[in-house]
Structure formats: C-alpha cells, structure tokens
Amino acid sequence: MAHDEALDSFLAEQPPKLHRSDRRLARAMREAYPIGVPALIMKSSTDRLGESAGYAFHLGTPDELLRRIASWLLTNAGDDQRVLLRLVGRLWGRHGREDVALAALLLANLDHVALGVDPWAVLASSTRSSEPAEALLLSIEELLRAGREMP
C-alpha cells in the first residue's frame, strides 16, 4: 500500500466524533505522523535535527503528508472550526516539529473572520518566551502564503 493510501485509510477510519475534541484530534494526529515516513534509516538524523532545532520530537513526516492531514482536518471540521483553533494551541504546546508545522498550516487556513480572531494574535499567544526560529518562520511563511496581512 502506498504511503498516501495508508494515510488516507487511517484518516478514513477515524470516527466523526473525533472532531469534537482537540485532545482526541491531537492524539490521532500523533498516530498519523509516522504513516508514510521512511523506515528508521533516517531516525538518527531526524533525532539530531530535532534536538538541534529545539523541538521535543521530530518524526520526519514529509510536508506533503502534513498538508494532507491539515486538509483532512479542515474539511472534516465543517462550519465550526473552534476545535481546530484550540488544536493549534495544543499542537504548539507539544513542541514537536510535526505539531508546529501542522499548527502553522491550520492557523493559516482557518476562517479567522468567522472565528472572530486575529491569526497573528493566536500565533503570539501560542508561543513561549523561547521558540525555535524555524517554527516561527514556518508559521509566518504559512500565514503570508495564505494571504494574511502582516500586523
């Protein structure tokens, strides 16, 4: 089974009620990250990269798979994206490379007008006093790519 098919199969198996809880979504996303990741050949290099960048963990999930996961989350959220907004903060809090990247993708693509939030304020409130530069740059890049105005 191809990596994309394995991920699609995993996501299709998730119950619809999963989208009612940011905790359950975060747990499911942690399970989804390794799907499609090359075998442990890359393990030592991803460990070193994650450690040097200041992440809590780095599984080596390709960006294209993270984008597929973000698309699935946004599609299945329906009209109410409040759970996804809470998920952004939860993902930042876990401090994994995949979590930060997924949080950036979600934050950039949420309907901020409907949620009544400023994406830059959400980003600022999610960060701690010390963050990996890569994480901040990734979030800023995704927000700008999505057409969000700089503050």
Model-based region annotation:
Residues 1-151:
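Alpha-helical scaffold domains
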